[in-house]
Amino acid sequence: MEKFVIRGGKPLRGTVQISGAKNSAVAVLPAALLADSPSVIDNLPDIKDIETLAEIIKRLGGKVEKGKHEIKIDPTGLNSFHPPRELASRMRASYYLIGALLSKFNEAIIPMPGGCNIGVRPIDQHIKGFEALGAETTIEHGFIRIKAEKLRGAHIYFDVVSVGATINLMLAAVKAEGVTILENCAKEPHVVDVANFLNAMGANIKGAGTDTIKITGVDKLEGCHYTIIPDQIEAGTYMVAAAATGGDVYVKGVIPTHLESIIAKLVEMGVIVEEYDDVIRVRREGPLKRVDIKTLPYPGFPTDMQQPFAVLLALADGISVITENIYENRFRYLEELKKMGMKVRVEGRSAIIEGVGKLTGAPVYATDLRGGAAMVIAGLAAEGITEVLDIYHIDRGYEAMEVKLQALGADIIRIRE
């Protein structure tokens, strides 16, 4: 087991380079399995979820050559549609293998997805879509089995906006016979990124980033060289860390338009934000103001950023409210922040946070990936020493977090116990 030990109270200063988008990468790697030749994917984040996916692809018969930020995937030897449970159950995004393997073999057997324990996250919209394409679904003994004689295009309306279902149905429909129309689609940047990757391999996908996506099935895809977009959530995390510590940080290698909702809330709180081509400067010189936050599908405020912002709201003047509209039960991390002096109560989908001005160091657990990031930010801003335990959650989605923070002047070390 490993933990972070943080001595707080030091403003972050300097420049941080943002890695490739986790949420893109975990879908692009399964998408590469659809080609009849190798693909090279770069700007890959060096995180645990990518290591897990690479190992799964090897177990399925694919060849993988992985560097730190680049991977070559050769799917020509793929011979299995049944990823091993011990690997696939580690990460929720393993469900993208369903769409990819269903498209490749007309069959997929996947263990129920793992990842962060943040409440009910059903995959009913995925299953509804697969069945509309002609597949049959059974769930037994902890596995999802999906099988089709032939996949045929269909008109599919998602009952709720779902990033996972939108991407998974693109993967499944890309080689299906005829035309597939997806309506009420997610518009997140990584949805567009996956569509761009598939199109670079020869797919015919139009409308990604809008409510309606049209997919005209093609007979074959060929591998390509592709660069993943920067990680908007990692960028947002460092922007919040700069504000929480009263620092001055240049967040480099970003697409500012992907961060508009995050920037808007920081500015509303009194943080100074300057935008350049691929750099955002974040600095705080005065007190933080209270704000209310409602998580919404993109371009609304991202659910993955409410946890870091909760720390900022604890340091602000007045009472703020976070309303979580995407996932149920995504406030478990707040119990840990209470140990550091946070005043908060949860009422249904809302967390009411009373600003306390300062936090104090304490031993806390990273309850999940983004909750773990919130613990680190709290530790950086707090008086005294904070220990963040169970940091494997953080390593699943943040590349070398302590190394990047050390370069900004943070007093943070990783300890192996």
Swiss-Prot record:
GO terms for molecular function: UDP-N-acetylglucosamine 1-carboxyvinyltransferase activity. The active site is at C116 (proton donor). Its EC number is 2.5.1.7. Keywords: Cell cycle, Cell division, Cell shape, Cell wall biogenesis/degradation, Cytoplasm, Peptidoglycan synthesis, Pyruvate, Transferase. Pathway: Cell wall biogenesis; peptidoglycan biosynthesis. CDD domains: UdpNAET. Cell wall formation. Adds enolpyruvyl to UDP-N-acetylglucosamine. This is UDP-N-acetylglucosamine 1-carboxyvinyltransferase 3. The gene is murA3.
